[in-house]
Amino acid sequence: RCMNLKQGIIIICLLLVLPLYGQSLSDYNPIWNTPSKGSHESMPCGGGSIGMNVWVENGELYFYFSRSGTFDANNGFLKGGRVKIHLTPNPFESGDFRQELKLEDGYIEITAGKEKNIIEIWADVFHPVIHVDVKGSRKTDIEVSYESWRYKNRLLRKDESHFNSYKGNPPEGLFTAKDSIGFIDNQIGFCHRNAAETVFDRTVERQGLN
């Protein structure tokens, strides 16, 4: 009877272990075999406090990026901007294409072109840094552009306030403030400065609590 009990325990353990052994996180990696038509077909990636949306469109590599806690005066969560990367020679003009999100290791791998150029994109989990690593059999020139749509104050329409704390009842003249963007040698610097008065102050005033 004791031997039968041990055999039963072993069989149960095997039944529990075998299904787990057959499952690998890499089996669920999203894989695309064609470039995207726009940002609505982007692939998420991130690490630590950094988040990205990555895609290839019309022969260019793009990604939006954001960081935890980047709220503006209206309590809207703002992306930092968009980065555009152009490669010469361009591997996206011909040959095969494959974009894969490596779930287990937390990075995106793009393989493109007749020579199977490899591009790896990931975020450092310990520092707010985004890495783009380009590998190929030939010398490749890389042109990187930073793009921002907050180059001036932008008046918000009523429906556009659903992304901030005003929702469907924004005050008249509400706007998203512009960023400060500058260039130092071969570097680009930018920041967003919130006004002294925020959505909290306006809410207190509206509710007569000031």
Predicted regions and their residues:
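Sec-dependent N-terminal signal peptides
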Residues: 7-20
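Short, Lys/Arg-enriched N-terminal segments with co-localized hydrophobic residues
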Residues: 1-2
